[in-house]
């Protein structure tokens, strides 16, 4: 599988106070340990770095992301993301700007989204976005 892992799942995986790994965290851990391709984008890296405090956490994030390919949006991705958001809005689903762009990157690069964010489930019902299921 080719997986795009959203900020929500990385955050769950790195929380100190998590009781037990969720099914999505297990999916991430299995993918990283196996032959699955795990990719991300600079926006996710930035959100993670902004959300965790301290030099140890920062170093951990940078180390983990050093081996993860980052997909980079281009002009066409931004245009398509706007179209995706408008399509969803016309059907009553509000999509945030970043979520729209992440969904578009998954669609363009044939990646399955791994996210704990329910908004992506709504996007997937209205667009070609595919969600990875644990």
Identify what each model region corresponds to.
Residues 6, 41-44, 116:
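A secondary-structure boundary/capping signal
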Residues 34-35, 64-68, 91, 109, ...:
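Structured helix-beta-strand junction loops
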Residues 25, 45, 58-61, 78-81, ...:
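A general structural signal for well-ordered alpha-helical segments in protein cores
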Residues 39, 71, 132:
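General small-molecule cofactor/ligand-binding pocket signal
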Residues 10, 45-48, 120:
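A generic structural signal for short hydrophobic patches within well-formed alpha-helices
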Residues 1-39, 50-63:
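Short, well-structured N-terminal submotif of metal-dependent ribonuclease cores
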């Amino acid at each position: 599988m080719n997986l795009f892992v959203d900020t929500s799942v990385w955050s769950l995986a790195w929380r100190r106070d998590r009781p037990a790994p969720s099914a999505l965290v297990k999916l991430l851990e299995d993918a990283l340990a196996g032959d699955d391709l795990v990719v991300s984008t600079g926006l996710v890296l930035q959100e993670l770095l902004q959300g965790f405090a301290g030099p140890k956490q920062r170093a951990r994030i940078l180390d983990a992301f050093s081996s993860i390919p980052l997909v980079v949006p281009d002009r066409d991705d931004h245009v398509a993301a706007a179209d995706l958001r408008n399509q969803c809005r016309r059907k009553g689903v509000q999509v945030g700007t970043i979520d729209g762009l992440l969904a578009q990157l998954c669609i363009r690069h044939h990646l399955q989204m791994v996210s704990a964010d329910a908004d992506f489930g709504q996007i997937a019902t209205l667009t070609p976005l595919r969600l990875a299921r644990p």
